[in-house]
Amino acid sequence: MQVHLRYLLRGRAYDQIRNSVCYPKLNVKICATHSGITVGEDGATHQMIEDISLMRTLPNMTVLSTSDDTQTKWAVEEISKINGPVFLRLARLATPIIYDENQKFEIGKMIQIGEGTDASIFATGVTVAEAIKAKEELEKQGVNIRVIDVHTIKPIDEEMIIKCAKETKKLISVEDHNIIGGLGSSICEVLCDKCPTNLTRLGIKDTFGKSGKAEELMKYFGCLLYTSDAA
């Protein structure tokens, strides 16, 4: 079964998702659009910035957040092979095409873009394109960055996180989501257990969203890395 949910409904439907889908481990795929702050002028009541946190804590749930159209096609194909609940997080905002059709995609395996050793930027969804912009800008200043596309939040790719912690000087996560319980928290949990390392978390800091243009909100909440001092 496939279900499409917009911003408000994934909160209202949480009890049903928990008890009627995840508990019996039903084969239900939830495609949730209009995620994060990029719905812009719709404002705080319509900006779902807690959904990753809500969904990744549910047993049996697989959680994905794709970064472009090509990757979304791969994700839809791959989640159809999973016999169980899946949450696919999608934004309303149009995003640049990052990948060609030949890029390898595997659920639970992050994609590394670049070989830089100065910093690793872990990004998911719409923030991947922004992280790539930051990489390009910082490289002009002699700072070598690798971007890690975290298209699967759960199960998290522990191997890639540990690899980056050992190979790069700084770790940064960026997400259009509350930093409590989201991508950054997922990475911190792995680092705490397996490879204690500092992580700078960028995203919405324990607050509700605001009404405004999508790019203005991304900048306001610190999701446009090339305008920040994080690296």
Q: What is each PLM-predicted segment?
A:
Residues 1-120:
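Conserved thiamine diphosphate
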